[in-house]
């Protein structure tokens, strides 16, 4: 079996975010890392929407990311620390829309190792040097400079190693133009390591160390080091030189401290805490991330605590000496992995879990009532400041980037009966968790819907003048009339536009600079800017059947297949070409391309005829109306559309932005198929046809604009958008009801919209999230969802949600009541009334936990609920709250053979589980009966067990439960579940159970798969085979009777198969006279499974399912990852295909090596050598290679570049999207 890996949705969790002017313009962009992906985002300063400019897979782990700019430069470069053992400097090239690798310097081994640098990066604020550090021992400094041609140069590395030293954080200190200096949080463990008593370990202190790079001596010195009182977790650089006092802020537990090199005294201030917080008061508070904003006259920091509260930190200075630190509560947003403050006044928050946000900073919070805390305020030792959290006041949310990270569980099923299955994804963490329903399609936002007096049959938009940015009129055609609407603040009917209103319209357009043309069945109406009208009437009894118009040309087809061609002359007159052309059959559809910039006319006309052909006809004056080429079609054409697509934007000498693309002829057929063929711009030949089935109705095509490029809207029983995005063609359905006719629409509120008609309504739509594969509906949950099952009869979901370090609702209410009583008791006689009021206000206050976070209860505290949910409406039908410290780990829905048709839900619960050091007071299996057609859970009984029941699976009318490392069969009893049989020989802990026939496949938490056979007659569970590798299995899926696919904690996927001669009729030989080796207790079972495939995904996979994703498609193995990625593994059906893709992969490995210097083959073989899998993500980078490299690779394969692209597209569309 050979598989091909494809990513459907890239990871959405963000681990790092940096900002800078990467494209060299004044506009700031954000570069984010999503594990093994680099992405460039640009927030639009006018609309506040975040657009993705570029996404690149780096096939390596991005461990650190920094932006830097050379002194006096205008462009920021990106330094990447990864697991490749190399430092890589990238530059964004806006003209090619790609990251270019400027430097790649090797310094160590590959992999994420303790002493190989790459974990921490620090840049001198003036861009003169960069320090790259490991977790332990090694630090390297590179000097950055320019050569004579102003290109970036990099020196050989200077070492600043110190053995037995752990590093916690590194930053560059802003010292102006003096020797660059770096500050590190370090800890020396040499004494602790050599001291057997453990005293030294308890006394080890963290130190703040300054390293100075002497530019004169080209050498790094350890300048100064001092021990710290508290344990710091990160450093913030304070602006220096002429901008500020220099130095660093150390964020540590409960305190923030300012330190500077020299005799400056330390200034420290406690981190304020929430008033009346339900958290454990003994728990320390730390800052987790920060952002700096610096202008010429001032600077401030925004730092976020682990509860999500942001504080604005300012420093008071007296002659460059810091005298106090001031903190002021700013706002609360979800806890971030990184924050960026942009010059345009935006705050980008890359959340640790869940969606990412872009906020507008509306106020700086200087003049509000919020109390300001200062290091100068007197406090008792151990006391702190208190503040009251509140909803957003200084920030305004302007955009939200959907993120599925972390996906904890996913099932694919068509519960909504839509033909195409939906993905039901349990994601998020704690109170920000959600169940999301993903459907393949683009999200459509409706900006306006208005009813029309009848059912129109067509709609167009036109501008008044060629220079206009926005459209002026919407023209709606009915069976016997035409309605003209003007576009302004509102849309109103106009009567003096010059259009003929008493007839239906076939087409209309802006002609020349400022004239309009209307084509109707009896003629052509040319309306000049001064409202003069010229008319051309059809001869005799003939009428116009079809037409095609653009800015300078009009072509009409009369009854009987006669073509008449008009072209505009320089004076603005429409002139008929002397000859007319008779076609051999009736004309069904026609299309003209837009006139290319700087040219007089479009050279080609495409005509579709009744005889199932499409013909290209020349409009060049030298051979006007002569046929150039023809293509036979499998069915009758319905509509045609010529567009220029796939171009990269370029600026010509005059600064005009044009794009160099290819001409494509899109052909919509009456049987619901869309064809896309390449139209040769010189000869007019048609080649390289791609086909896709869109739906059951004839396909109508419309040209629209998306992100400054032409795109095609195709309408069948569903509407689809064909567009080019990041050097790949996308054909994506719109998640919207059926439309009938459409046109591009541009107005101030909606610069790239679509106006469409559906029955008797006119709709204005916008598509914002281009490039998105799925649109999603999210239903909020209370705790982290762990697993869910689908009730087969009602299609309801039964979800178990469990959080560690959390309180149940009952405990929270109890704690609040207790605190309120304490408040009243603590008050004196005269303050009793006031205290009672405060206590009442405290009890009534309810800040949403999804923003303000849930109180942390401490380790060993668990909260769980069992939820029954309708997945289509998203409403909760039943909610069972478990008691404090009961944690639900497994769930199953099953029928028992002795109870008939009733459905039961079994939930495995652990009691008082402590994770480290591990201990558990036992567990229970709760049994519920599903009543009311699967909408309510009726509690039957709970069965005590001795360990955590981490896996439950229905089995032959009974149920299999993995209790710790015991595998048991239970049956339903009156008072509890009855144990029927057990097996004690599983190694560590059962994490999952799959069943097929008499076989049970058990996944062990660290010993891969174990095959067990249930013998009914002897009532025994007997192990008959296992795997040879230790795998830390997270999830598994059965592929057939002998084959299982599994994923492990380290990001690998494997497929394991039992050899054909495996015998599962083994005996546990009770007589004991068999050979010892057949008992196989020492090294597992006597029969071993074979590994069919191994593949390193690079992200922990938490769900696997064999399913089909598109109606009529083939089966594939779908996986979802912890970082929010969704991918599929598809089997090759022919040896030729496998051979072809193997060669594509081989050539791309050498021609297009990964961006961060990691070797592709060794990345995919991180833990196990990659076996029988071809990396489709690498193969698809063929599309973004430079044309000459594409040509080289395809010549090696004896193909042309379009043929290779077609193969890549075909394998994708056969299985997915």
UniProtKB/Swiss-Prot annotation:
One of its GO terms (biological process) is mRNA splicing, via spliceosome. It is found in: Nucleus. Residues 1100-1123 are annotated as: Interaction with SF3B5. It comes from the Eukaryota. The record marks 284, 306, 352, 429, 916 as: Interaction with SF3B5. The modification Phosphothreonine is found at residue 1200. GO terms for molecular function: nucleic acid binding. Pfam families: Beta-prop_RSE1_1st (PF10433), Beta-prop_RSE1_2nd (PF23726), CPSF_A (PF03178). Residues 193-231, 786-804 are annotated as: Interaction with SF3B1 and SF3B5. The modification Phosphoserine is found at residue 156. Keywords: mRNA processing, mRNA splicing, Nucleus, Phosphoprotein, Spliceosome. Its main location: nucleus. One of its GO terms (cellular component) is U2-type spliceosomal complex. SUPFAM superfamilies: WD40 repeat-like. Residues 1028-1049 are annotated as: Interaction with SF3B1. InterPro entries: Beta-prop_RSE1/DDB1/CPSF1_1st, Cleavage/polyA-sp_fac_asu_C, RSE1/DDB1/CFT1/CPSF1, WD40/YVTN_repeat-like_dom_sf, WD40_repeat_dom_sf. Component of the 17S U2 SnRNP complex of the spliceosome, a large ribonucleoprotein complex that removes introns from transcribed pre-mRNAs. The 17S U2 SnRNP complex (1) directly participates in early spliceosome assembly and (2) mediates recognition of the intron branch site during pre-mRNA splicing by promoting the selection of the pre-mRNA branch-site adenosine, the nucleophile for the first step of splicing. PANTHER family: DNA REPAIR/RNA PROCESSING CPSF FAMILY. The core of the protein consists of three beta-propeller domains. Component of the 17S U2 SnRNP complex, a ribonucleoprotein complex that contains small nuclear RNA (snRNA) U2 and a number of specific proteins. Part of the SF3B subcomplex of the 17S U2 SnRNP complex. SF3B associates with the splicing subcomplex SF3A and a 12S RNA unit to form the U2 small nuclear ribonucleoproteins complex (U2 snRNP). Within the SF3B subcomplex, interacts directly with SF3B1 (via HEAT domain), SF3B5 and PHF5A. Identified in the spliceosome A complex; remains associated with the spliceosome throughout the splicing process. Component of the spliceosome B complex. Belongs to the RSE1 family. This is Splicing factor 3B subunit 3. It comes from Pongo abelii. The gene is SF3B3.
